[in-house]
């Protein structure tokens, strides 16, 4: 498989998405493209609410025009339209991206998931449902992708210092977004092997975070 060059990261306004975009941008051989919900000063970015009915069409046009070779599926919420944002909209985006990559016979999809997609936790039923759903869809897509040239990696994260976790009592002990971003982009930089899933968490962190 050819080396990836053009990378689109969704949900870049803050937190891990912003850290991922900056990490990609720091590598000379990688070209970073960002997605934001609201307009910014970036003239090369993709804009729009992932829950809008026309967003899949905007995404399709963007990835084809920019010849995106790696899609980092990071956009998500903890409260509000949880199922719509974390699952339904992501399924639609992944269908669009996978179809394009399959046509090109190459491409990498990196789904940013959560330990909540592996182990259920009390008080987070909707969030866990959205993450379990993303896991199921991605695992099925991995099977469909065999022989297509498309590689799909699921990243299950423990607690990360982002806007979503600012109110937690243990915020200071959570993983730093910049550190997590470096590990994830290491996957993009790896040509010699394919990782279909990886879990990142602090050594002393419960698997049910």
Predicted regions and their residues:
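N-terminal Rossmann NAD(P)H-binding glycine-rich loop of SDR-like oxidoreductase domains
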Residues: 13, 17, 21
């Amino acid at each position: 498989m050819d080396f990836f060059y053009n990378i689109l990261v969704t949900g870049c306004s803050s937190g891990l998405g912003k850290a991922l975009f900056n990490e990609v941008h720091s590598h000379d051989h990688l070209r970073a493209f960002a997605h934001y919900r609201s307009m910014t000063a970036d003239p090369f970015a993709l804009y729009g609410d992932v829950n809008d009915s026309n967003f899949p069409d905007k995404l399709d046009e963007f990835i084809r025009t920019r010849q995106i070779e790696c899609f980092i599926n990071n956009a998500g919420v903890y409260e509000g339209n949880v199922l719509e944002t974390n699952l339904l909209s992501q399924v639609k985006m992944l269908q669009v991206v996978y179809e394009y990559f399959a046509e090109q016979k190459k491409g990498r999809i990196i789904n940013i998931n959560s330990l909540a997609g592996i182990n259920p936790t009390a008080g987070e039923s909707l969030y866990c449902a959205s993450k379990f759903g993303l896991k199921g869809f991605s695992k099925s897509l991995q099977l469909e992708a065999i022989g297509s040239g498309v590689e799909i990696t699921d990243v299950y994260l423990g607690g990360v210092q982002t806007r979503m976790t600012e109110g937690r009592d243990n915020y200071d002990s959570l993983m730093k977004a910049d550190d997590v971003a470096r590990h994830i982009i290491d996957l993009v930089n790896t040509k010699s092997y394919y990782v279909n899933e990886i879990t990142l968490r602090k050594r002393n962190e419960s698997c049910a975070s």
